[in-house]
Each structure stands twice: as structure tokens, then as C-alpha cells.
Amino acid sequence: MFKTPGFTLLELTITLAILMIMATIALPLYHQFMASVELKNSSRLLTIHIQKAKYDAILRHKSVVLCPSVDLSTCNSNWDTSLISFIDTNQNLQRENNEEVLTNVELAHRYGSLKFQKFGKKLNSIVFQGDTGLPRESNGTFTYCSYKQLKNFKLI
């Protein structure tokens, strides 16, 4: 009698059970890993665009606004989607059609949310003054909150 190579039903069931246990353990760790990657990327992108907005304000001697945006052209209050920086010629902290967009970047957070706690005026943007490049009345703290973890991380 010849033996045919293959797996018995018992071997297949045990293998699938072991794979399911490993997947159950690995899935939360994967989410935690992706949240930490998103945190590092957000911190890097924020630092780059804050420095770029400050540089543009000093270089052009005009106020530059860095703010969150949904459509990459107007400011809103959601820091999770994207950022824009523009020259604010009329000093109203909102982008008009004639004001040039200097940079825009999509953030698209999936594993957490980004918040900006501002000191001073309640508008949700950072203004870099053209004479010094300093963020007058715009200082604050960026905080990244993971959806699955209990602790928050201060970025900048």
C-alpha cells in the first residue's frame, strides 16, 4: 500500500489554531507599531513645515500662517488631514484667493489624532511674523493621541 503525501485533518486544524493564536497576539502590536511610526512621521513633518514657514516669513518679510486644511486651500480646525502655509497679506489669518500658498502637505492620520493646544488667541493657526520670524501669540503644544493607547505624546 502506498502512502500519499499530505496533511491529515488533525494536523491542519492544529496548524490553523496556532496561526490564529499568533494573529491574535500580533494584531494589537501591529497597531501600536503603526501608531508609533505615524507619531514619528507627524513629528518630522511638523518640524519641517514649521521651520519652512518661519524661514519664508524671514525671507519675504511678511507674515506667514501655518494652519490645518481639509481642501489644501482654506484653513479649518482639523490638524489630522493636511497643513498649508501661506503669506497673509491682509492679516486676517484666513487664506484669500489672492494669497499665495507656500507649502501644503497631507497628513492623513489613521492610528491617532493630532491636536494643537494654543496659548493666547483662540484661532487654530500659527503666525510667523515677517520682521523676526517668531510666532507672536501663536505658541502652543502639538499632542498626538493614539486611538488604542491610554497615553498621549507631546510632539513640539
PLM regions: where:
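N-terminal single-pass transmembrane signal-anchor helix
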Residues: 1-30, 34
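N-terminal helix-rich module
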Residues: 25-40, 47, 55, 59, ...
